[in-house]
């Protein structure tokens, strides 16, 4: 009886020892396999180019479009795009869902629904006074009008550059421009600007400071006027202050998140002739105009090429900002 019990206990102990040995052996084998596998992965990883799924995948759901194997953030997925267009476009299209249609078309170019905003403006005058360029990227469409050519080119100069501006009290003070980057910017429904250059004795040069009729007229009934006079010379100004506001401004540099698209016209606006435009490049393009649908289709087709020459900026531009810091 006791011999049977001892044999049973001995068999059980041997089984436990054998099982323990087998488990330890399996553990050592698995450790060897895992560590060897990880070692091989570490050695070969610099030479392998594996697709990181979830990065730069087409948001359209299509896997046909080739995407660069990169972990860089796709800017369109986190950026906003604003399109500014004249009200006549909305009137001509006359479709309550045209913006939704364009949003779906922008989606095919990588811009998620809700990232593209459409903003209309009545005319250049109202837009220049209150641009409201709030998006990461801003495309301003201006239909060519020969009668507004000066206003269009000056509006382009205004919104394509950053300006530091201060109020001017022309009733009490004389003003001079210090360098080529220093301009006087006037905005309003009708801006007529006259200037009288002064000598060192504050006497008018070719004009009488007491008679504005003898002043030189540099802008007549314009909605937006950027005035440039001889640097380092004091001037007395006459401005139609009841319909116009004038500011003393300094051009700081390009506003790289704004582009101007001229719609139609045989002449192309060009602001690069200004020596203060540095570098001598501009974010402007012209598209042919027949119908506004055609214009928007063209912009959707080329939106990514346009944005590639721009830079995402966080600083916004509105009427209040313009008067003090643009």
From Swiss-Prot:
- Keywords attached to this entry: Calcium, Capsid protein, Disulfide bond, Glycoprotein, Host endoplasmic reticulum, Host-virus interaction, Metal-binding, Outer capsid protein, Signal, T=13 icosahedral capsid protein, Virion
Name the positions where Ca(2+) 2 binds.
177, 228-229, 231, 301
List the signal peptide residues: 1-50
Region ranges (GPR motif): 253-255
- Sites of glycosylation? 69
What role is this protein assigned? Calcium-binding protein that interacts with rotavirus cell receptors once the initial attachment by VP4 has been achieved. Rotavirus attachment and entry into the host cell probably involves multiple sequential contacts between the outer capsid proteins VP4 and VP7, and the cell receptors. Following entry into the host cell, low intracellular or intravesicular Ca(2+) concentration probably causes the calcium-stabilized VP7 trimers to dissociate from the virion. This step is probably necessary for the membrane-disrupting entry step and the release of VP4, which is locked onto the virion by VP7.
Other comments on record: Some rotavirus strains are neuraminidase-sensitive and require sialic acid to attach to the cell surface. Some rotavirus strains are integrin-dependent. Some rotavirus strains depend on ganglioside for their entry into the host cell. Hsp70 also seems to be involved in the entry of some strains. In group A rotaviruses, VP7 defines the G serotype.
Supply the name of the protein: Outer capsid glycoprotein VP7
The species is Rotavirus A (isolate RVA/Pig/Australia/AT/1976/G3P9[7]) (RV-A)
